[in-house]
């Protein structure tokens, strides 16, 4: 068993920290401390704001002075990150394709979840926090599927998080994905409007008239003998949206373990593919500090490029 000890901290709340609940603030400040311990020290009155006891739902205001007490907690050895996990964290440093004082943008590798949960203790956001232990604030702006690679926005300030998430809600952010799909995509199929319903038991998403309105726009990038490379732009942001909409048209994405086609997977597997061929390649949005439009491109990993080379040769 190892032990984690923190020192007493006094934090002056500025405009950027204001507006968040004290429990969420403490979870950011005490990253290695279990949630149960955080709620306990709040409940016992050990956390003080302006020298007064507060409840977990208290929302911080600019000018507040927060006292965070010293905390000691035992850490089980199996919870300590092994060397393989540390190597993955180090590798992620090289996947950061843009960074400034307000945000960073990651070219997330396929197979990495955006956050821990559902049996996963470590995700991209946890890895970034491990890389930047001094960072006061690191939060996901949006999410992409674990098996999807590509652009992932992370806010470094609460004001940036609010600004960027507002753009996602207002649908002013333009996102473009590259996907390799089975068969010959029809040039006439430029938009798929099909409501999506998620099964809460197995998380499978299907087109269903009772589902949420969902729209994806498509463009053909390159045609092959048995496949098509397409660009997909989701107008709405439903779970598995691009994957289900392509399946719905009869052209599932290569190596999609939920919605794919085994014969097509076997064919592309012979070309070296062993992961979902879906990549968040391009994004356009307004910078949170000055509203200037930005465009970011994330290159595909060499494995996907090699598959395309193999398909061209097969033609």
From Swiss-Prot:
GO molecular function annotations of the record: 23S rRNA pseudouridine(955/2504/2580) synthase activity; RNA binding
Superkingdom of origin: Bacteria
Enzyme class: isomerase
Keywords: Isomerase, RNA-binding, rRNA processing
Domain S4 RNA-binding: 20-93
EC number per UniProt: 5.4.99.24
PANTHER family: MITOCHONDRIAL RNA PSEUDOURIDINE SYNTHASE (PTHR21600), RIBOSOMAL LARGE SUBUNIT PSEUDOURIDINE SYNTHASE C (PTHR21600:SF92)
Name recorded for this polypeptide: Ribosomal large subunit pseudouridine synthase C
């Amino acid at each position: 068993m190892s032990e984690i000890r923190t020192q007493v901290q006094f934090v002056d709340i500025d405009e950027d920290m204001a507006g968040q609940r004290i429990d969420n603030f403490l979870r950011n400040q005490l990253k290695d401390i279990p949630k149960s311990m955080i709620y306990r020290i709040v409940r016992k009155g050990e956390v003080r704001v302006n020298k007064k006891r507060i409840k977990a739902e208290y929302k911080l205001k600019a000018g507040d002075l927060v006292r965070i007490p010293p905390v000691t907690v035992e850490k089980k050895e199996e919870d300590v990150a092994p060397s393989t996990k540390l190597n993955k964290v180090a590798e992620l440093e090289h996947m950061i394709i843009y960074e400034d004082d307000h945000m960073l943008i990651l070219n997330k590798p396929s197979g990495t979840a955006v956050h821990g949960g559902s049996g996963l203790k470590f995700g991209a956001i946890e890895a970034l926090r491990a890389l930047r232990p001094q960072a006061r604030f690191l939060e996901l702006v949006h999410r992409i599927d674990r098996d999807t690679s590509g652009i992932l926005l992370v806010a470094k300030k609460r004001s940036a998080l609010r600004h960027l998430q507002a753009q996602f809600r207002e649908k002013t952010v333009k996102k473009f994905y590259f996907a390799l799909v089975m068969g010959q995509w029809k040039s006439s199929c430029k938009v798929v409007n099909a409501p999506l319903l998620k099964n809460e038991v197995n998380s499978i998403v299907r087109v269903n008239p009772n589902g949420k309105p969902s729209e994806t726009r498509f463009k053909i990038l390159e045609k092959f003998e048995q496949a098509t490379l397409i660009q997909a732009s989701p107008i709405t942001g439903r779970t598995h949206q691009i994957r289900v909409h392509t399946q719905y048209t009869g052209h599932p994405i290569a190596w999609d373990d939920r919605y794919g086609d085994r014969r097509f997977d076997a064919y592309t597997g012979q070309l070296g593919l062993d992961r979902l061929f879906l990549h968040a390649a391009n994004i356009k949005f307004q910078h949170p500090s000055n509203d200037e439009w930005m465009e970011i491109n994330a290159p595909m990993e060499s494995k996907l490029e090699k598959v395309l080379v193999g398909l061209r040769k097969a033609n």
